[in-house]
Structure formats: C-alpha cells, structure tokens
A protein has these predicted regions:
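Bacterial N-terminal signal peptides that target proteins for export
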Residues: 1-9
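Coiled-coil-like amphipathic alpha-helices with heptad-repeat character
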Residues: 2, 20-21
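Helix-centric, low-specificity signal for extended rod-like, repetitive segments
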Residues: 18-19, 142
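Cys-dependent protein tyrosine phosphatase-like superfamily
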Residues: 22-140, 155-207
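A phosphate-binding catalytic loop at a beta-strand-loop-alpha-helix junction
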Residues: 141-153
Length: 207
C-alpha cells in the first residue's frame, strides 16, 4: 500500500515539474528548504477518513487514520504523528492510536482541540505544531477527524511560520478540507483563532 501512496505523490509532482523528475522538498526538521508547495490529494484507499493529502516530500494531512494507515505511513518514513482530536472522539476509535504510534517507533504529539473554552483553537496550538515540525526527525502526519481542523491549523502555520500570503495559505488549505462555510461562531473561522486575530488584521506582506 505504501508503494502506491509514493507513486501517486510522485506522479502528481511529475505532472507539474518541467524536468519530469520527482524531487524531494523538505518542510520538516531544522533544515527545511524552499517554499511550501500546494497539497496533492491522494486516494484514501479506505485507510484515512474522507481526506488524505501530501504537502511536499514529508508532510501528510488527513482524517482519522486506520491502524494500517499508520503502519503504511511509518513504512514511508513518518516519524511524528500530530493528532488534533478530542478525548471523547478518540474514545470512539477502535484502537489505541497513541499506543500504536509509540509501538511503531513514532513520536505522538497530542494537541486536542474542539473550539470550546476547554479545548480552544489558539496561537499556542500553532506554536506547538511548529515545534513538532521543526523537531521532526522524519516525515509528519497531521490529522483530525476529516482534516477540517487540520486544514485550518495548517493555514495558520503557513501564515504565521512560513510567511505565506493569507490568500495562498487559505487556497492551499481548501485543497485539503478547509470548508469556508463551516465556522466556529458567526463569521469567525478557526484559522483566525489560531492566529489570535482576524485575517484582515494579519500584517502586511501576508495578505
């Protein structure tokens, strides 16, 4: 299964590369390189709930993974799993994700959030995710239930930590599962809570 995942990602990269060569683009670790490419949607193959995408050479963003999905990604070099789901949500998952991740030799970063006072979307979450990205020794999986929260966190990370313009960050997150019509309350979006300010207030150079 992991061979098919790699082939799909490589094929997508080749379709846009003038050289026709699938080249690596690191986004994790202390020595990440280059600009952030657009996500590539991959077939979930029943291993991830609803959404599965790859960004660059070493970041995956998805809905809830199955046991086999985690095993396949480990075989692909994933060393860090970042989970945004709340404890009640994880209680409904038919296996112990934290235990499996550790059993497979990966680091488990648990950042539960629901947009509630108890589990808020906050700038601290972006900081924690950025630390996980820079500290990763290999590839990273970021997931929630259907990649909606993950898409908003990814957009905030791009804006806050990678100096990606707001419009570009939102467009790339839409390619995963941003869904602008789903909001926290009124007109507020999770990405704004992650940033700690409205998108219209984001500094010059990131609009």
């Amino acid at each position: 299964m992991h061979v098919n995942i790699m082939r799909l990602a490589c094929f997508a990269a080749m379709s846009t590369a003038t050289s026709g060569v699938c080249t690596a683009q690191r986004l994790t670790g202390a020595h990440s390189t280059g600009s952030v490419p657009a996500p590539v949607a991959l077939d979930t193959r029943g291993l991830f709930q609803e959404k599965f995408a790859r960004v660059g050479d070493d970041v995956f963003i998805s809905g809830q993974p199955t046991e086999q999905g985690l095993r396949d990604l480990r075989a692909q070099g994933v060393t860090t799993v970042v989970n945004l789901r709340s404890p009640p949500e994880m209680a409904r998952v038919p296996f112990d994700e934290a235990a499996l991740v550790k059993q497979l030799g990966m680091e488990y970063v648990y950042l539960p959030m629901r947009g509630t006072p108890e589990l808020p979307y906050s700038p601290a979450a972006v900081k924690s995710f950025a630390a996980a990205m820079s500290g990763a020794k290999g590839k990273v999986l970021l997931h929630c239930t259907i990649a909606w929260r993950a898409s908003h966190l990814w957009a905030a990370y791009l804006i806050q930590n990678r100096d990606v313009p707001v419009a570009t960050a939102l467009e790339q997150a839409r390619m995963i599962n941003l869904m602008d019509d789903m909001r926290m309350d009124g007109d507020r979006q999770p990405v704004e809570a992650f940033l700690g300010r409205a998108l219209a207030e984001v500094g010059h150079g990131k609009r």
